[in-house]
Amino acid sequence: MTRTLPPGLTATAVVAASSANLGPGFDSMGLAIGLYDEIVVETTESGLVVEVEGEGSGQVPLDGSHLVVRAIERGLRETGVSAPGLIVRCRNDIPHSRGLGSSAAAVVGGLAAANGLAAQTDSTLMSPERLVQVSSEFEGHPDNAAAAVLGGAVVAWTAAGAGDPRYAAAPIRLHPDIAIFAAVPQVRSSTAETRVLLPEHVRHTDARFNLSRAALLVVALTERPDLLMEATEDVLHQPQRAAAMPASAEYLAMLRRCGVPAVLSGAGPAVLALSTETELPAEALRYGADHGFAVKRMSVGHGVSWTSGVAVRT
């Protein structure tokens, strides 16, 4: 039985950006980054109001097709509650269409906000495992979604078998000596646009290469960061996407020539560097600035959080 929420309940969710793939871990590895979106939702008697500040303002829909709204509605169904009306306020710091998991953050944040509303009843809330499953259903793959839910670095997978896909993830401990740098350009790209550049089939030798590097990447991230250069090598998706984002491909190559383990962040065009140095080489910083990249050291992102309460009117 579905319970109708009364007007005046509020919930706030805070969700991190994320970087998927990390080189060889295509669709299976992710890392939460300390850049956050905030979603504030309030139940009302009727209607829908969507407000967006920051990234995406004036560009994303302000109706029921908004990804956050769709995720909230799915989350309410998951927890057995409904809301006659909603006010949804999104404060976005995660850049859109740059490969930093903005869509996963929208979905995970919306689901967490729904948990925050449902927590004010005796409903059963979505567990972290369920949040990974439902958010990955939106995304179609669990790497960004799992990182946004759990925080830190994750290995994610899709269980084999008949029926609907079952998604799961496990956190891995990131070595404390690893520093994270994000280089974000002004240009945009979509995962859908760059995914079509990938071949339907790959050579056995290429598959073997990436399997070895993905396995090595877990070792490098957790115990042996000195192996990150070799561990972040990839032949399955980054070379194929290079023509669609030449500036990012050149910056990635330039960083690696400087000895910096660098990868495309997700489908790009942002570039992620994982280094044991506290600063990038001066040459790399100059190149980034000259070619329109905003380069910044980032912290490791925490898992999605939510709070709930009652709206106060003044």
Swiss-Prot record:
<dbReference type="Pfam" id="PF08544">
    <property type="entry name" value="GHMP_kinases_C"/>
</dbReference>
<dbReference type="InterPro" id="IPR020568">
    <property type="entry name" value="Ribosomal_Su5_D2-typ_SF"/>
</dbReference>
<dbReference type="InterPro" id="IPR006203">
    <property type="entry name" value="GHMP_knse_ATP-bd_CS"/>
</dbReference>
<keyword id="KW-0963">Cytoplasm</keyword>
<keyword id="KW-0418">Kinase</keyword>
<keyword id="KW-0067">ATP-binding</keyword>
<keyword id="KW-0791">Threonine biosynthesis</keyword>
<dbReference type="InterPro" id="IPR036554">
    <property type="entry name" value="GHMP_kinase_C_sf"/>
</dbReference>
<dbReference type="GO" id="GO:0004413">
    <property type="term" value="F:homoserine kinase activity"/>
</dbReference>
<comment type="similarity">
    <text>Belongs to the GHMP kinase family. Homoserine kinase subfamily.</text>
</comment>
<keyword id="KW-0808">Transferase</keyword>
<keyword id="KW-0547">Nucleotide-binding</keyword>
<protein>
    <recommendedName>
        <fullName>Homoserine kinase</fullName>
        <ecNumber>2.7.1.39</ecNumber>
    </recommendedName>
</protein>
<dbReference type="GO" id="GO:0005524">
    <property type="term" value="F:ATP binding"/>
</dbReference>
<feature type="binding site">
    <location>
        <begin position="95"/>
        <end position="105"/>
    </location>
    <ligand>
        <name>ATP</name>
    </ligand>
</feature>
<dbReference type="GO" id="GO:0009088">
    <property type="term" value="P:threonine biosynthetic process"/>
</dbReference>
<keyword id="KW-0028">Amino-acid biosynthesis</keyword>
<dbReference type="InterPro" id="IPR013750">
    <property type="entry name" value="GHMP_kinase_C_dom"/>
</dbReference>
<comment type="pathway">
    <text>Amino-acid biosynthesis; L-threonine biosynthesis; L-threonine from L-aspartate: step 4/5.</text>
</comment>
<dbReference type="InterPro" id="IPR000870">
    <property type="entry name" value="Homoserine_kinase"/>
</dbReference>
<dbReference type="InterPro" id="IPR014721">
    <property type="entry name" value="Ribsml_uS5_D2-typ_fold_subgr"/>
</dbReference>
<dbReference type="GO" id="GO:0005737">
    <property type="term" value="C:cytoplasm"/>
</dbReference>
<dbReference type="InterPro" id="IPR006204">
    <property type="entry name" value="GHMP_kinase_N_dom"/>
</dbReference>
<comment type="function">
    <text>Catalyzes the ATP-dependent phosphorylation of L-homoserine to L-homoserine phosphate.</text>
</comment>
<dbReference type="Pfam" id="PF00288">
    <property type="entry name" value="GHMP_kinases_N"/>
</dbReference>
